[in-house]
């Protein structure tokens, strides 16, 4: 039995080691979880940026300010142009990047955090900022990010989703690198990611019916993962290794 009634226990964190082993150290037969009350309220900021470098740096600024948003997600222009006709979330399709920052908790906590995040984003160079004024508008802002994957199917026969994770301060550098790879491999890439923890989900768009495109998509994905490792990151943050990333393990180790 690992863990306990406290979220963190003193000494070695064997619970994290066991979970992180992904089944190599044993099989979980029973899980005990703690239920917490649903936050009383939540609001989200939608910030637009004129370039991905500024947007990436804004993410680092939010975290550096000691703010821990309930949600911190980012989409590049390819992604916002992909989803806006599909869900009409109100995204600025001329913006190079869209950042969604959510605060939840009591009314007073949310208002304070929204004010702090707004100040940080304005200082980081956001070209436009909108704050949800109702639950319906909050869900509308989020609808674009949540529908990024099905929206990709509207503009491309196939897509290849990656799962690299990088230090947040390297977001701008990696996004710039991925843009260069689009030219190298001759394929488009829509970037959507969990900006708060640096977990990238680039969607490489291709057509498997065209000879060579699948192989180019695989090579593109391998290059993205190699870049993630080069900047101090890892080849997977959520999806695991499996068969898909087995060759990239040699890059990681």
List where the protein language model places each region.
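Short loop segments at secondary-structure junctions
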Residues: 22, 104-106, 208-209
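Glycine-rich beta-alpha junction loops
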Residues: 35, 51, 76-79, 103-107, ...
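Short N-terminal helix-initiation segments at or just after the protein's N-terminus
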Residues: 35-49, 99-104, 137-145
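Solvent-exposed beta-strand/loop surfaces of large extracellular or lumenal domains
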Residues: 71, 81-83
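Conserved glycine-rich FAD pyrophosphate-binding loop
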Residues: 75-77, 85-98, 110-253
């Amino acid at each position: 039995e690992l863990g306990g009634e406290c979220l963190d226990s003193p000494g070695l964190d064997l619970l994290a080691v066991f979970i992180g082993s992904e089944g190599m150290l044993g099989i979980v037969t029973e899980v005990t979880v703690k239920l917490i009350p649903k936050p009383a309220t939540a609001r989200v900021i939608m910030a637009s940026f004129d370039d991905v470098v500024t947007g990436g740096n804004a993410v680092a600024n939010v975290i550096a300010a000691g703010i821990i948003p309930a949600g911190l997600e980012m989409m590049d222009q390819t992604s916002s142009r992909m989803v806006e006709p599909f869900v009409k979330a109100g995204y600025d399709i001329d913006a190079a990047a869209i950042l969604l920052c959510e605060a939840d908790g009591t009314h007073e906590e949310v208002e304070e955090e929204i004010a702090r995040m707004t100040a940080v984003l304005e200082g980081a160079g956001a070209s436009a900022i909108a704050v949800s004024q109702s639950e319906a508008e909050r869900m509308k802002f989020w609808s674009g990010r949540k529908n990024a994957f099905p929206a990709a199917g509207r503009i491309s026969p196939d897509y290849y989703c990656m799962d690299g994770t990088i230090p947040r301060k390297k977001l701008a550098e990696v996004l710039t690198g991925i843009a260069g790879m689009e030219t190298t491999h001759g394929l488009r890439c829509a970037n959507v990611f969990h900006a708060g923890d640096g977990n990238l989900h680039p969607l490489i768009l291709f057509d498997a019916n065209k000879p060579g495109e699948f192989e180019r998509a695989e090579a593109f994905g391998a290059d993205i993962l190699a870049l993630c490792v080069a900047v101090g990151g890892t080849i997977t943050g959520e999806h695991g290794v499996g068969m898909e990333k087995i060759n990239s393990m040699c890059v990681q180790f």
